[in-house]
Amino acid sequence: MAEALYYGGRQRQEQPRSTQLVKATTAVVAGGSLLILAGLVLAGTVIGLTTITPLFVIFSPVLVPAVITVALLGLGFLASGGFGVAAITVLTWIYRYVTGKHPPGANQLDTARHKLMGKAREIKDFGQQQTSGAQAS
């Protein structure tokens, strides 16, 4: 039967031996089945590679350029799709900014715009002072 053990001041029930035996048996059966399945997959992979390798060697002058072409086409489509999504995102952000819906980052853009306008005004004033001082002398 189950025995009561005291662990850390608390009572803990230990499982009966039959339950432990069932758990151990289930674990061994499941683990063994998976191990056998892994061995069969490994054997199938080795046999498949052994039979397919000569075909790869014979057809490699055709397969290598074809694989390179397909890879480049796939990367091109992936890049163009990514650029398209980025463009749509940027255009959506600009639309929200122009219509006054205040998209994320609009405060930073406004701050940068005001700083640039202030610096441009300072440079303009400095240039006017320099030209008026040069004309007076």
UniProtKB/Swiss-Prot annotation:
Expressed in seeds (at protein level). One of its GO terms (biological process) is reproductive structure development. Its main location: other. It is a multi-pass membrane protein. Keywords: Acetylation, Allergen, Lipid droplet, Membrane, Transmembrane, Transmembrane helix. GO terms for cellular component: extracellular region; membrane; monolayer-surrounded lipid storage body. The chain crosses the membrane at residues 27-47, 55-75. It is found in: Lipid droplet; Membrane. The keyword Membrane applies. May have a structural role to stabilize the lipid body during desiccation of the seed by preventing coalescence of the oil. Probably interacts with both lipid and phospholipid moieties of lipid bodies. May also provide recognition signals for specific lipase anchorage in lipolysis during seedling growth. Belongs to the oleosin family. This is Oleosin Ara h 11.0101. It comes from Arachis hypogaea (Peanut).
